[in-house]
Swiss-Prot record:
Biological process terms in GO annotation: ubiquinone biosynthetic process
Protein's organism: Paraburkholderia xenovorans (strain LB400)
EC number: 4.1.1.98
Cofactor: prenylated FMN; Mn(2+)
Positions contributing to prenylated FMN binding: 184-186, 198-200, 203-204
Entry superkingdom: Bacteria
Active site: 322
Coiled-coil region list: none
Protein name listed in UniProt: 3-octaprenyl-4-hydroxybenzoate carboxy-lyase
Residues binding Mn(2+): 181, 247
Length: 522
């Protein structure tokens, strides 16, 4: 189903009972987090906080708080009563589309060639289009009117350093790339028009910024932040879209209609384009540092001094409660100065919180897991299923089910998964099992680990690999180890002993007891 903007999606969710309006006053300082967290853990609806007692904007939370709503946002019309299972299965179709876009199969005949041409035409037809007089610029704040405190920016946890923008789609462009990049990076409010842009070094926005700083030293770097885009654009920004395809174009494929874009209004930022029907847009720059920077506070990490981007204004970010369930360490990141804010009339502020799983990012991880499966299966045909348990912070542990064909096969799959997609670079643990193990059932996974693993033989340890900066368990920030566990049945060459034979009841006996079951009343 097509959703032309966030409001269209909100209306659809309300119609099918997936959204609840909250008229009571709920503060964006801690209270919204507590309420959203309780509702999400109960599998409840999205929440629209309508009271304007504290701010002039309604706040939308828990938008993607269930896999079904993620599927709906991706254009899959999950029917009422189907539950999350049906929605997850339908998301594999999105993965198959991505797989075809990432590595198209060579045509084996006229029929295949026709399908390939149809796909290419579909991608071509979804090229974004620029519109004039966009709704996202119905209201414009400039000069002293630009005050981020006028927005209902959440403070999520008691130990947070301050208010935090959590669902902003950051739009950047590198000097050597034709397409714009969309990324979601949290942004700490530190002044009337200043935010800290927390993007890690490997993320698209940080790479664009670094390339710009190298080629344009001393020049301000333009950035736009979108708050409240249509669901296809939001989800396109968190999906592993091939580098040759823009997130806007992929959003068009999900939506079934071209993404309408608008040029930013601020001179110097007008080379960036944002969704024309977005609720709120922040336009501005990351400016070069003027004068000598103030010294780092006692006990804080040192300021960045290496690289062209170090010459730009930075600030100490955090601590904040994160998706790990802990407060993260402080670190230096660039400062984004907002020069102009544009918005729709009666704009909606879209927000979320992160915390110990399950939270909204964990739900997104469960849904995107199904998108990953076809991508992995195309590269590794032996993989029969793949699961990122949400308890593992969505990506730190992966369980792989495979059809094993030779000794050492499981180890090959481990290294393949670690190296295949950027999304798995930070996966610390991989457990590989056979086809007879349901990888979504912890009881079966633990059974396989405890009965099919010899720790010395079946454990793979890899030291000094890229690791999540937020992973305080690693000895060095951003660098740590990985573990692979081969919980498959062992083949000759992997063991000298006779391997165990699983206990299975006779099929005729099972059928006989099935026929008696209702009579027994057990």
């Amino acid at each position: 189903m097509k959703y032309k903007d966030l409001r269209d999606f909100v209306g659809r969710l309300e119609t099918i009972g997936e959204l609840r309006r909250i008229s009571q006053t709920v503060s964006p300082v801690l209270e919204m987090t507590e309420l959203c967290d309780r509702v999400l853990r109960a599998g409840g609806p999205a929440l629209l906080f309508e009271s304007k007692a504290q701010h002039a904007f309604p706040v939308l939370g828990n938008l993607f708080g269930t896999p079904r709503r993620v599927a709906l946002g991706m254009g899959v019309d999950a029917q009422a009563g189907e539950g999350d299972g049906a929605a997850l299965e339908s998301l594999r179709d999105v993965g198959r589309l991505l797989s075809a876009l990432k590595e198209p199969e060579p045509p084996k005949g006229l029929k295949d060639a026709g399908k390939l041409l149809s796909l290419a035409k579909a991608v071509w037809d979804m090229a974004p289009k620029t519109v004039s007089a966009p709704p996202c610029q119905e209201i414009v704040w400039e000069g002293n009117d630009v005050d981020l405190a006028r927005l209902p920016i959440q403070t999520c946890w008691p130990g947070d350093a301050g208010p935090l923008i959590t669902w902003g789609l950051t739009v950047t462009k590198g000097p050597n790339k034709p397409r714009q990049n969309l990324g979601i990076y949290r942004q700490q409010l530190i002044g009337r028009n200043k935010l800290i842009m927390r993007w890690l070094a490997h993320r698209g926005g940080a790479l664009d910024f670094r390339e710009f700083a190298l080629q344009n030293p001393g020049k301000p770097y333009p950035v736009a932040v979108v708050l409240g885009a249509d669901p296809a654009t939001i989800l396109g920004a968190v999906t592993p879209v091939p580098d040759t395809l823009s997130e806007y174009q992929f959003a068009g494929l999900l939506r079934g209609g071209r993404t309408e874009l608008a040029k930013c209004l601020t001179p110097g930022v007008d080379g960036l384009q944002v969704p024309a029907r977005a609720e709120i847009v922040l336009e501005g720059f990351i400016y070069p540092q003027e004068g000598a920077p103030s010294p780092a506070p006692a006990g804080a990490p040192p300021r960045p001094v290496k690289g062209a981007s170090a010459a730009y204004e930075h600030a100490l970010e955090g601590p904040y409660g994160d998706h790990t369930g802990y407060y993260n360490e402080q670190e230096w990141f660039p400062v984004f100065t907002v020069e102009r804010i544009t918005m729709r009339r009666d704009a909606i502020y879209h927000s979320t919180y992160t915390g110990k799983p399950p939270d909204e990012p964990a739900v997104l991880g469960v849904a995107l897991n199904e998108v990953f499966v076809p991508l992995l299966q195309k590269q590794f045909t032996e993989i029969t299923d793949f699961y990122l348990p949400p308890e593992g912070c969505s990506y730190r542990m992966a369980i792989v089910q495979m059809k094993k064909s030779y000794p050492g096969h499981a180890k090959r799959v481990m290294f393949g998964v670690w190296s295949f997609l950027r999304q798995f670079m930070y996966t610390k643990f991989i457990v590989v099992v056979d086809e007879d193990v349901n990888i979504r059932d912890w009881k079966e996974v633990i059974w396989a680990i405890t009965t099919r693993i010899d720790p010395a033989r079946d454990t793979v340890l890899v030291d000094r690999t890229p690791i999540d900066y937020l992973d305080f368990a690693s000895p060095v920030a951003g660098l740590g180890s990985k573990m692979g566990l081969d919980a498959t049945n062992k083949w000759p060459g992997e063991t000298d002993r006779e391997w165990g034979r699983p206990i299975v009841m006779d099929a005729a006996v099972k059928q006989r007891i099935d026929s008696l079951w209702n009579e027994l009343g057990l």
